[in-house]
């Protein structure tokens, strides 16, 4: 077991009870690209080359962690999002591909000189991606987690963008001073506590619950708070952008 071909077969065998074949292939590709710095072409052309023992041992260790439920992004400590690289730790949600759609949507409206607020910024992936997309914009991210704020600040430096990240609680905005914004964007907690049973263990066991869940009796808690905040801190022609729970699409619009 000393080539890419052999290691991929090993991963397929070890992880088949937890992941689909396609997911395992994608995970293997991520490891080869992140650790060996191979391209897609390298992976194909060099699949039968003898690998260094240090990488083989590292790969086996990664598979064991994956088998225990740890997400690959936390294992490697980084992930890709919107063409950028982000440090990824259990202090913030793992950036999801579907959130890139939100970034693209907001990016169509964001202009140089605009002030943008990212509520519940987590790793900073939304705000940082938008700051990179429109470098003349003034981007601020807020979160209630000190660890997430520190992670977002590190990611801003990593990606060479100017964005500030502040410890703030949108449910109690009166406890801090705020600017007035042209755009407010948020991917807030929106999964009801009762929906936990439908979620994968690797999400429930490893990602921060305060960034995922809302009470069953108040699923629009954060959307309502942000909408009310916008009444006093959004310019008259300002815009709100959200990632939402599809089960409450119409109710969210009604706010």
Segments the model singles out, each with a brief description of its role:
Residues 216-255:
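Conserved Class I SAM-dependent methyltransferase catalytic core
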Residues 190-222:
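Mobile active-site "lid"/loop adjacent to the S-adenosyl-L-methionine
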Residues 1-44, 48-49:
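Non-catalytic accessory regions of SAM-dependent methyltransferases
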Residues 98-198, 247:
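Conserved SAM/SAH cofactor-binding pocket of Class I
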Residues 15, 156, 230:
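Conserved hydrophobic residues forming the short capping helix/wall of the S-adenosyl-L-methionine
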Residues 43, 51, 76, 170, ...:
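Short clusters of hydrophobic/aromatic residues that line enzyme substrate/ligand-binding pockets
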Residues 106, 130, 203, 226, ...:
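Class I S-adenosylmethionine-dependent transferase superfamily signal
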Residues 32-105, 109:
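Conserved AdoMet
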């Amino acid at each position: 077991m000393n080539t890419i071909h052999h290691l991929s077969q090993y991963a397929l065998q070890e992880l088949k009870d937890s992941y689909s074949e396609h997911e395992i292939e994608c995970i293997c590709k991520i490891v080869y690209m992140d650790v060996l710095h191979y391209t897609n072409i390298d992976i194909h052309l060099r699949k039968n080359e003898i690998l260094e023992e240090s990488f083989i041992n590292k790969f086996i260790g990664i598979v064991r962690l994956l088998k225990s439920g740890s997400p690959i992004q936390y294992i490697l400590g980084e992930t890709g999002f919107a063409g950028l690289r982000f440090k990824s730790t259990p202090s913030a949600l793992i950036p999801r591909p579907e959130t890139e759609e939100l970034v693209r949507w907001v990016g169509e409206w964001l202009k140089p000189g605009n002030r943008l607020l990212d509520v519940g910024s987590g790793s900073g992936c939304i705000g940082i991606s938008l700051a990179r997309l429109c470098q003349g914009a003034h981007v601020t991210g807020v979160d209630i987690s000190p660890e997430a704020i520190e992670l977002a600040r590190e990611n801003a430096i990593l990606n060479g963008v100017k964005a500030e990240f502040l410890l703030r609680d949108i449910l109690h905005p009166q406890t801090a001073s705020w600017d007035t914004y042209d755009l407010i964007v948020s991917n807030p907690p929106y999964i009801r506590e009762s929906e936990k049973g439908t979620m994968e263990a690797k999400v429930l066991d490893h990602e921060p619950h305060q960034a995922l869940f809302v009470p069953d009796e108040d699923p629009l808690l954060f959307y309502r708070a942000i909408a009310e905040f916008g009444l006093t801190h959004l310019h008259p022609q300002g815009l709100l952008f959200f990632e939402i729970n599809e089960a409450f699409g119409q109710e969210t619009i009604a706010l």
